[in-house]
Regions:
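Transition-metal
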Residues: 1-196, 266-284, 303
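A short beta-strand-loop-beta hairpin characteristic of the jelly-roll/cupin
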Residues: 67-73, 213-229, 315, 321-338
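Acidic, glycine-rich loop-and-beta core segments that form the ion-binding/anion-interacting portion
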Residues: 197-255
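Short acidic-glycine-tyrosine-enriched beta hairpin
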Residues: 223-236, 240-243, 306, 331-350
Length: 367
């Protein structure tokens, strides 16, 4: 049986007072910043599903009948857990600079107590509004030229390894930068970047205003910038250093909390594990939808989107979350309006969609 969902909102400081509230038809601006709305079974915030007039945790519902809710194939591949987490994400302030481990790294790290779970955390972000992110390294020589162009000899411990093509050594120098003199250095970086005036340098100035003692504010000069238009998406696999800067979008990821931070945060950093996991050679991937599906290398998830019109049929046999972001869409026995969602269990069979609105759906990927 399908069921409407009620979903938790996460009030992180970097979130928006308006984006999620407006989409879901609640009073806007919200009193507190709303960063994310979660759709799924995550232990830190499971959705609730309406069945037979009663709201029940979706996580408990899945645990009570894994094969019926997830399907035998999904259980065989991922165990008795929904392998993905779907989100609305609203970014008003930059997130931390971060990276996630591969499946093998997560399993090994969990066994030795480094990670909180044994799962990878690949991510796909699809823009609903213009969305800006930093992801993947620029060529080392290009980064050395940009940062060296600031004309600050104090940055030589970072610039020199970049110029030599040793990105890992440069990253180590950055995250282990001496505490003494950081405020003065960041002030000099901000002034030099402001004098240049280019868009990436303007981002450096913005980050330095938020994190006035963090040399990771140089990230716009050593990472690639991605400006996504609505409907455009980027996939971030294991080892890809990244940071969301601004915008509103639909995000889907592997169900994991494994995060390694490299800066732009006051949270602790595991430097050695960060350097072991970060892979400068792995680029982010721009993903174009094929037949409405954003196909990625991640087996945990696949994101779909469509304006169904007179009719669209999705195959059955997989656990699927439906999310309307505009207009009205009928699917799984429900008429969904913006911000409304439903869970369709694997046992339901094919899902008939119709309507002039915009629908996103989440389902497991393929191996």
């Amino acid at each position: 049986m399908t069921g409407l969902l009620r979903n938790p909102v996460k009030n992180y400081d970097w979130g928006s007072h308006t984006a999620i509230a407006t989409l879901t038809g609640r009073p806007s601006p919200a009193e507190r910043p709303e960063a994310e709305m979660w759709f799924g079974t995550h232990p830190s915030g499971s959705s609730s599903v309406l069945r037979d007039g009663t709201w029940r945790s979706l996580a408990d519902t899945v645990a009570a009948d894994p094969v019926g809710e997830l399907g035998a194939e999904t259980v065989e591949r991922f165990g008795s857990r929904l392998p993905y987490l779907l989100k609305l994400i609203a970014v008003d302030l930059p997130l931390s600079l971060q990276v996630h481990p591969s499946r093998e790294q997560a399993e090994e790290g969990f066994a030795r107590g480094t990670y909180v779970d044994p799962f990878p955390k690949p991510e796909l972000i699809c823009a609903l509004t213009p969305f800006t992110a930093l992801a993947g390294f620029r060529p080392a020589g290009e980064a050395a030229e940009l940062i060296g162009g600031l004309g600050l000899p104090a940055l030589e411990p970072f610039v020199a390894p970049l110029a030599a093509g040793d990105v890992s050594a440069a990253l180590r120098a950055l995250v282990q930068w001496p505490k003494e003199g950081r405020a003065e250095l960041l002030d000099a970086i901000a002034r030099a970047a402001a004098a240049d005036g280019g868009p990436d340098h303007e981002l450096v100035v913005r980050l330095a205003g938020i994190h006035p003692e963090d040399p990771a504010c140089l990230a716009p000069l050593f990472l690639r910038r991605h400006d996504l238009r609505p409907g455009e998406a980027i996939f971030l696999g294991a080892g890809v250093l990244h940071c969301y800067l601004s915008g509103f979008g639909v995000e889907i990821m592997g169900g994991s909390d494994n995060v390694l931070r490299a800066g732009l945060t006051g949270k602790p950093m595991d430097v050695e594990e960060l350097l072991r996991v970060t892979d400068p050679s792995v680029p982010p991937l721009r993903i174009e939808p094929e037949g409405g599906l954003y196909r990625t290398p991640a087996p945990e998830f696949r994101l779909g989107t469509a304006v169904p019109g007179a009719g669209l049929t999705l195959r059955g046999g997989v656990p699927r979350i439906l999310l309307c972001t505009a207009g009205e869409v009928e699917g799984g026995g429900h008429a969904l309006r913006p911000g409304e969602s439903a869970f369709v269990p694997a046992s339901y069979g094919p899902v008939e969609l119709r309507g002039s609105g915009t629908l996103f759906w989440a389902e497991p990927g393929t191996d």
